[in-house]
Amino acid sequence: MPARTAPARVPALASPAGSLPDHVRRRLKDLERDGLTEKECVREKLNLLHEFLQTEIKSQLCDLETKLHKEELSEEGYLAKVKSLLNKDLSLENGTHTLTQKANGCPANGSRPTWRAEMADSNRSPRSRPKPRGPRRSKSDSDTLSVETSPSSVATRRTTRQTTITAHFTKGPTKRKPKEESEEGNSAESAAEERDQDKKRRVVDTESGAAAAVEKLEEVTAGTQLGPEEPCEQEDDNRSLRRHTRELSLRRKSKEDPDREARPETHLDEDEDGKKDKRSSRPRSQPRDPAAKRRPKEAEPEQVAPETPEDRDEDEREEKRRKTTRKKLESHTVPVQSRSERKAAQSKSVIPKINSPKCPECGQHLDDPNLKYQQHPEDAVDEPQMLTSEKLSIYDSTSTWFDTYEDSPMHRFTSFSVYCSRGHLCPVDTGLIEKNVELYFSGCAKAIHDENPSMEGGINGKNLGPINQWWLSGFDGGEKVLIGFSTAFAEYILMEPSKEYEPIFGLMQEKIYISKIVVEFLQNNPDAVYEDLINKIETTVPPSTINVNRFTEDSLLRHAQFVVSQVESYDEAKDDDETPIFLSPCMRALIHLAGVSLGQRRATRRVMGATKEKDKAPTKATTTKLVYQIFDTFFSEQIEKYDKEDKENAMKRRRCGVCEVCQQPECGKCKACKDMVKFGGTGRSKQACLKRRCPNLAVKEADDDEEADDDVSEMPSPKKLHQGKKKKQNKDRISWLGQPMKIEENRTYYQKVSIDEEMLEVGDCVSVIPDDSSKPLYLARVTALWEDKNGQMMFHAHWFCAGTDTVLGATSDPLELFLVGECENMQLSYIHSKVKVIYKAPSENWAMEGGTDPETTLPGAEDGKTYFFQLWYNQEYARFESPPKTQPTEDNKHKFCLSCIRLAELRQKEMPKVLEQIEEVDGRVYCSSITKNGVVYRLGDSVYLPPEAFTFNIKVASPVKRPKKDPVNETLYPEHYRKYSDYIKGSNLDAPEPYRIGRIKEIHCGKKKGKVNEADIKLRLYKFYRPENTHRSYNGSYHTDINMLYWSDEEAVVNFSDVQGRCTVEYGEDLLESIQDYSQGGPDRFYFLEAYNSKTKNFEDPPNHARSPGNKGKGKGKGKGKGKHQVSEPKEPEAAIKLPKLRTLDVFSGCGGLSEGFHQAGISETLWAIEMWDPAAQAFRLNNPGTTVFTEDCNVLLKLVMAGEVTNSLGQRLPQKGDVEMLCGGPPCQGFSGMNRFNSRTYSKFKNSLVVSFLSYCDYYRPRFFLLENVRNFVSYRRSMVLKLTLRCLVRMGYQCTFGVLQAGQYGVAQTRRRAIILAAAPGEKLPLFPEPLHVFAPRACQLSVVVDDKKFVSNITRLSSGPFRTITVRDTMSDLPEIQNGASNSEIPYNGEPLSWFQRQLRGSHYQPILRDHICKDMSPLVAARMRHIPLFPGSDWRDLPNIQVRLGDGVIAHKLQYTFHDVKNGYSSTGALRGVCSCAEGKACDPESRQFSTLIPWCLPHTGNRHNHWAGLYGRLEWDGFFSTTVTNPEPMGKQGRVLHPEQHRVVSVRECARSQGFPDSYRFFGNILDRHRQVGNAVPPPLAKAIGLEIKLCLLSSARESASAAVKAKEEAATKD
């Protein structure tokens, strides 16, 4: 059958547009009987008549619509004006605008050749049988096709009595009006013929079925293809008559043909019979089929009346004349609109276009030219007969046919086509089978072992099916995906499609191969993020069998619904105890981004042959006995508890109640159903049916678990034990033993007391009765016993803290206690009994005991009154430290309390104190030195102050002040309205100012009651200006050093309580070393070279008193300082203490960011590193050539070491016990980061996780220092259970430990990156503090507290609102890098300029580095590149600023405008009244898959789901020069999690070097592999500046320990000398 041409849209003309087609007239008549209101009737009729109206009328109708929408016109007025307009301009009464066409012998719109009826007859499946004709009913797409329709009754002609548009427009019955003009060539014969045709048409009108449906299709096609024509002349009538004669001849022969049968197996065999017939019977306005001229003669059917040469010549001349006439008419009419322009015009008008009819079975448009299935293969047989063929048999006479009766044979199938029961080619992946639509297929079946895709050796089959299931297989890493059909008789593996089915199957193959990529990727990367998935998609080469050059992100989004469905199907084939891979982070991101609908029926689609091995990714964890004991013995008890809680809550959280999965009944077959009472089970498990587990709720729970606790509410601090009502003491029960030790302050102290005949003395431990009897007994150490003046018998309790009251919670050892800084005076009557608490000191050989069998029992613990402790616990900071070594003296041994002493020291340290007084004048005391928090401040010292402490004379504008918003053209920028918030992620708009800095000129305070009032100390100081505080504003600070200041003689008086710390400010010319060496010599160092005069706004030479800090201020001129000023306290220079570098093992090292920071801090020498990923391991080797890098599994290496091996299989030397002094690393949380509950299913994975392996490394090697780095959510995973167990293991080993969250942006990088850090120090070492922030940063990104079990924990950091230095910006980071284009791949290029900022100078280094490496960026697809080009270059711009225009891409493809065809109930209409919705879900309905749009400049998926995801703010966003990077990820994608990855001024994503700089890597640092490998190395790394800051804190601990050791050695030497 020749391909039919698509209906052509023609412009409306001022000349007559032709009469109405028959189907329109019939529909108009039906409307009168539908009982519609006047408004509905008008709307429906306008819908039908719209394309037949003239251009001028359409324009006026659109104006009326606009006025109606803007409420400038009432609804009644609108209807009246529409009627008036049409009656005035389109009425027949004026005789000028007739819409009818003269009956000149031209073929009618409704005419239809005989072959179409026969085609409809024969195109049915065997299941479709003739049905009895029923009474006439309104035509619809769902009418059943008629089988036996007379060919002569099908061909109809248009009557000369045509109904006008206005006659149909008015509501009410309409009568036909006879035509007044005489028709040319109207003879008695033609009139009789017309009467016959009318009669036949009336017969056809009463029929329902195939003939009516096909006739309706042809009438639509003919009506839409009808173009403007000149009045036909007499010769046109003659040609038409001759053509009609040929048609009648063909019909007679067709009617007489006895071989024609209305069966699907024969309906295509006679297809060629109608080819010539179709060409000869086409309407005059229909273009000639060009393929007809090229057909060979043997293809023409013999029964067709031959066309004479004269007829062909006349036809060709007629065609030429019609083309010429059309060109003349088009030159005077409105130009033809493009498809996108027509859609845009229609979106503004309420009047929709006429919907083309659809097939009631497959739902496809009947005017699709490629709709029909052509023909069956030769000698095709039915399925049962085909299956009995010997060609398909693989068994011999001795073989068993089936193993069981339930088994089905499996064959291969090639040259196949799939079609519905009406013969329309159908895809199988659009949900038709799931909707129970019967699909059949034909082709050639072959034996299962035959892999030749040709039809040779096979047997042809027809009408196989219907298809019960279609399935996929081959997710095993191979090249091919197997696609199969299942019928009631057999299963078929598809090979190659037929030629006609190839385009449909090609689209299906693309989405299937993408699904294969996704499933196989997630098998080994269950924790991959969206950017990782895009990386995999874009780097996979498509197979040659599909017509696709490359896979892109747009390909994934286009097929997202299908891909997610396949992943869900894959999960259904897995075991119940396996985590669904569709809950992985990348799949959840895809679901949200593409707006995928979950929970749809998948019963007819399955995944076969899943070959993924269980727990394939990590090997079984190698654990030490201590770690194994904690995880496998104790924690299993907690698992049972959480399992019980999960089961109780399972039914509540398993349903959303909306999706199809939730609404379907229980299957009755799964494990959960079989346990239900209704299916005969016990009902104990209380689990939902496995088939009804809601995917929407699972995704929501997984999303909730990943959300960080940014806004941590204020939690109550841990309650201290307060004594309740005083108990009435029983003197008989309590009595003092012995004489009083001391009488002091109305208290008589004793050493011993008897309680219930049990002796208790100072230093013993007791259990105390709580006020609430439901709580367990409190435990305390008795530090004092006394009786007050009122006879109350009291004791002082230093409380122990149970493990359950610490951050460890339920994971703690029930026998382990912790000392805390809390104590209280209590009545002796509260004591319950005496208990035994043993101090468990670390053994002398502690470091070498790693990996051995730990002690599991505590002697005497069976009595229930024996406990042990080994650490002090700080409840506010969650720090476990070694207990203080303070010993009692003779003066305080009767009341020695560690808690009291510690609290007294803290209070004494925090209180301001005057150290040296100079003089007193008028009641004011002038001082030379004061102290606070252990820091001494002297005259001439420089101090930090909060930004509000004083102001400057120069008013500086904000560096990121936004310009006023101009009005936006919403037609061009339809998504701009979503930018209602001024907040821009990555902006420093709300970043605080850094500390003010001043030099102390004068210290004074008042007197109170004759004493110095130390609570009211004032400082007079000189102000230092930062560059941004001068008139040069922030532009002046960009090029200067970040620690450069300007001297000023301006003074300010501040409170000493406002001082935040001390710093060093030196005049640059007075330094004995370079400014760079001085700045890097220690923390808090500044310099100045000039003074700033704010009055003249000039920079001057500093005065002498600024250059000579030794000349102290005079205290209002009344005295002079004594001696030379000392900038800092006298202390031993650091250079005098030689600190050997710690021998370090870096596990999960990546490219080496953590080690690089420790190297910069000067504390570490990384001798060993473990990294399985080869590109990262190679990068580590490039930057650390002296390091032994292992590329093996860490579990394998630890197993070798524990077995006593010295080298690995490659001969590399393994570190032995005692070699490793520092262990650092960031173990991936692979396999257990998806959900926030521990249960028996996920527990087994956690036991084998890399966190457990890393802790086993720590236990075996027992390093001096241990650091674990991970994502911020590490502290929140699984009810914080991962954090608790990690700390529990460290405590059990004997380590001091703590945890905290740090923001990398506060340590000198232009990036927000919060990281969880766990620090541990061996017994005898000092546990490091977390480093204080160095730079100010956006407060929104600095929420660093953590809530565990409803308790809020913070770190020791005190700089919460400001910092010493300003924030580092994107401009500081990369403004000096040369410009490159999208896809730049040159790994080495010149800098082409000097560094412009302090940060750039630091990263370039002092060495000569003429080559810039890794300044390369990803080559984005043409569509993404076009979007990037259209993102504006102003701050905060993103996808919402894209114009809605049509663009030609770099590959020549056209990117279309996005069409808005739905009302968005949430966002309303635009200012122009345009719609804002792109899917039916915007109206509150279910999503319509047919609403999807692709290859548009504005990505369709973003406005589709924007209302639910904060309008996708930041996607396709540009970085801001004065802002910062979002967390650098492993693959910069414009639509990825990071969001703003576009260069501020260039149309590309950020380069590898720019990302590396955002992490703080120096330019000399090398990366390895392709561009995506390098991006991944950078994104996974720890920012070296953050690691350096932590390393410097470890260095302070080492220095402190070294000083104490040196002091102890000196003291011991002196004592030895004294003895001698």
From Swiss-Prot:
Record PTM Phosphoserine, positions in chain: 15, 138, 140, 146, 150, 152, 240, 515, 555, 713, 717, 735, 882
Active site: 1229
Sites bearing N6-acetyllysine, chain numbering: 171, 255, 372, 752, 895, 961, 965, 979, 1114, 1116, 1118, 1120, 1122, 1124, 1352, 1418
Biased composition (Basic and acidic residues): 192-205, 246-267, 286-300, 1126-1135
Region feature (DNA replication foci-targeting sequence): 328-556
Cross-link Glycyl lysine isopeptide (Lys-Gly) (interchain with G-Cter in SUMO2) mapped to chain: 255, 1611
UniProt modified residues of type N6,N6-dimethyllysine: 70
Tissue-by-tissue expression: Isoform 1 is expressed in embryonic stem cells and in somatic tissues. Isoform 2 is expressed in oocytes, preimplantation embryos, testis and in skeletal muscle during myogenesis.
Protein name in UniProt: DNA (cytosine-5)-methyltransferase 1
Species this protein is from: Mus musculus
Gene this protein is translated from: Dnmt1
